[in-house]
């Protein structure tokens, strides 16, 4: 079976402006959640389909951008396989609270993508 897109995330330099724009453009339910260590993460609930979130961009000098998360059974093995195929690891495998495990890569063309293993898999 294929690896579905599980989550999309907006890393923005202006959360307030992004919230205003997307809440008017789409019928999304936006819910703020406190993040460990401070700050706010906004969950995006879309009803049917892949949901997501938005947060302040953590990479100084990087333009606002969307990040796609692809579901994998084993994030460590998939990260290693991607690296063997020429990807660069931007964010190494890390736990995300009680939700799951992730990594962020750039493919051989320079495009960023995140791998996501839901908690309870493997």
How should each PLM-predicted stretch be described?
Residues 64-83:
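Mid-chain, well-packed structural core segment of small domains
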Residues 1-2, 10, 14, 54-63, ...:
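Short, low-complexity cationic-aromatic patches
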Residues 46-47, 53-55, 69, 85, ...:
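A generic structural signal for ordered secondary structure
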Residues 2, 9-49, 96:
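Core segments of cupin and vicinal oxygen chelate
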Residues 43-45, 71, 104:
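Short, well-ordered beta-strand micro-motif
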Residues 28-63, 108, 112-117:
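Conserved short beta-strand elements that form part of the metal-binding/catalytic scaffold
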């Amino acid at each position: 079976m294929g690896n579905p897109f599980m989550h999309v995330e907006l890393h923005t330099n202006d959360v307030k402006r992004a919230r205003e724009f997307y809440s008017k453009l789409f019928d999304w339910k936006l819910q703020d959640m406190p993040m460990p260590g401070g700050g706010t993460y906004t969950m995006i609930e879309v009803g049917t389909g892949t949901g997501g979130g938005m947060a302040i961009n953590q990479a100084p000098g990087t333009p606002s951008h969307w990040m796609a998360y692809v579901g994998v059974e084993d994030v460590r093995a998939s990260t290693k396989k991607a690296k063997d195929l020429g990807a660069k690891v931007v964010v190494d495998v890390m736990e995300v609270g009680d939700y799951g495990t992730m990594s962020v890569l750039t493919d051989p063309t320079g495009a960023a993508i995140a791998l996501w293993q839901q908690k309870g898999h493997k």
